[in-house]
Amino acid sequence: MKAAEARALARTLAEELGANPRVQLVYVFGSAADPDAAEVRDLDLAIGGAPSFSREELLAMAARLGSTTGITLDLVPLERAPVVLAHEIANHGTCLLARPPEAETSFVLRARDAYWDFKPLLEQQWRLAGARQEARLRGPQA
């Protein structure tokens, strides 16, 4: 699907999701939110609810909406998104629905705050992963 079509579809799906009064936030992220993308294979939407949606509820919503659109739809619960993914959504995703409007600001601030707290650990993980990769490339030491 063309990226522009996917973005338009995401807006339509956000409106449909917004018919549920529990839905407070809907973001499109991934390739469909990338202004440089020409094609997308799936549509990534992050959804925030009060109370948050169960895995079963999200799977049912994704199946229902995906069956009517013909594209694979991934729904990610914002409340349970890993720190790095939440940061990616906050920084590079597009908010399609925020109810109330300050819900978007609240999510972005929480996601960035959690990421900055986690960033030193993430950098250490990358250093350790790099050291392990270098050791594998060198092979066994005699």
Q: What are these model-derived regions, one by one?
A:
Residues 44-46:
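Short, well-ordered beta-strand segments
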Residues 1-25, 33-39, 48-142:
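Catalytic core of pol beta-like nucleotidyltransferases
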